[in-house]
């Protein structure tokens, strides 16, 4: 279904950015400003960062701004009162703005479970989805892919790895194996004993990508890569055993596909998230993009390692949840969001992250119901249980 993408005609595309103040959102704005003849930021939304969304709105002059935190509504409204910009607040408003008739593309770049319902609303409104919120497919992959097929909506991946896989696809040629690359995170060379004592500051020092705090911690535990495995299963319709995680510290190969004849096709480049963002907006066209270029002569070596699930059990838990199916990935995601925040707030140690997730997987009732109601209730139960374990 992700190839159902005959959406880009010659008119300027109006983009709704869910999460304009985050890492993906700010880089998407850079892409839009580089190609202001092709794209327009029609809607900007933020959860809490009123100051940044105000400055973005004053610069980009969108039609609509939404601040999800209702306590910040008056601050945003008053700061933009001299401009003809509609300002709304609250989670419900996020689901409403994506349905605006003038919106062509919804960039789903909110972090976490909060991105699920606005993405569903956008699919039902038949908007093209540029998907950066991986939790949407982790939590509700079955539901999302079913809705995308039903409403004939294209889903274009924005994750660097999934964009790489998407760029390597050959319609009509089956995927034998997906090679999902991973930098290995800041603790790649740590022993099991050393990992027991790492701090949030150690974890936030990611070696390659500039990301928000939540995803940086997930990258340190390899849960981020586990989520990407689940995401790849739904985006590309492959079985879990067809997805192989490959540790590639240089982050030059962003991912690859092996075809049935054994040929491997990879996408290479410098680590710049603007490229997958722009490609999701412009597909099937490629547009100029300013910035660094990959210089093959400067590469000393490209190395590859197997992931160690003894030292990084979160990757194993993600695979287990995918094999079990049903609401198990939803349970893992909910518990992970709780422990991720607790670790960032210095309330738990690093080893507790995987331990609490695993205990939550064992405790919360399993269900094969793929309705939104089931996912909402599972998410609530799993969060509450994980919080009690902290």
Where are these regions (language model features)?
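Catalytic, metal-anchored helix/loop core of enzyme active sites in primary metabolism
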Residues: 11-390
């Amino acid at each position: 279904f992700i190839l159902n993408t005959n959406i880009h005609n010659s008119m300027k595309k109006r983009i709704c950015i869910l999460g304009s103040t985050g890492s993906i959102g700010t880089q998407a704005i850079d892409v839009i400003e580089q190609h202001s003849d092709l794209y327009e930021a029609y809607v900007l939304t933020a959860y809490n960062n009123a100051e940044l969304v105000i400055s973005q709105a004053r610069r980009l002059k969108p039609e609509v701004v939404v601040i999800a935190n209702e306590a910040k509504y008056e601050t945003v409204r008053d700061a933009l009162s001299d401009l003809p910009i509609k300002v709304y607040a609250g989670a419900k408003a996020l689901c409403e703005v994506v349905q605006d008739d003038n919106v062509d593309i919804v960039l789903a770049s909110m972090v976490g479970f909060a991105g699920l319902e606005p993405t569903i609303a956008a699919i039902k409104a038949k908007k093209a989805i540029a998907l950066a919120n991986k939790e949407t497919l982790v939590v509700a992959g079955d539901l999302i892919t079913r809705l995308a097929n039903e409403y004939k909506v294209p889903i274009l991946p924005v994750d660097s790895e999934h964009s790489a896989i998407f760029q390597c696809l050959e319609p009509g040629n089956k995927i034998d194996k997906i090679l999902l690359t991973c930098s290995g995170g800041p603790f790649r060379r740590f022993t099991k004993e050393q990992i027991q004592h790492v701090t949030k500051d150690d974890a936030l020092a990611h070696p390659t990508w500039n990301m928000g705090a939540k995803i940086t911690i997930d990258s340190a535990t390899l849960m981020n890569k586990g989520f990407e495995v689940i995401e790849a299963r739904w985006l590309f319709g492959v079985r879990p055993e067809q997805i192989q995680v490959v540790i590639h510290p240089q982050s030059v190969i962003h991912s690859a596909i092996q075809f049935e004849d054994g040929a491997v096709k990879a996408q290479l480049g410098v680590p710049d998230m603007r490229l997958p963002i722009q490609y999701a907006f412009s597909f099937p066209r490629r547009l100029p993009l300013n910035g660094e270029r990959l210089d093959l002569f400067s590469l000393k070596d490209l190395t590859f390692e197997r992931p160690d699930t003894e030292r990084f059990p979160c990757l194993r838990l993600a695979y287990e949840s995918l094999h079990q199916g049903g609401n198990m990935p939803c349970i893992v995601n909910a518990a992970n969001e709780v422990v991720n925040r607790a670790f960032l707030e210095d309330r738990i140690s690093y080893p507790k992250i995987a331990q609490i997730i695993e205990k939550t997987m064992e405790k919360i009732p399993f269900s094969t119901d793929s309705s939104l109601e089931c996912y909402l209730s599972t998410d609530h139960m799993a969060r509450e249980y994980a919080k009690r374990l902290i």
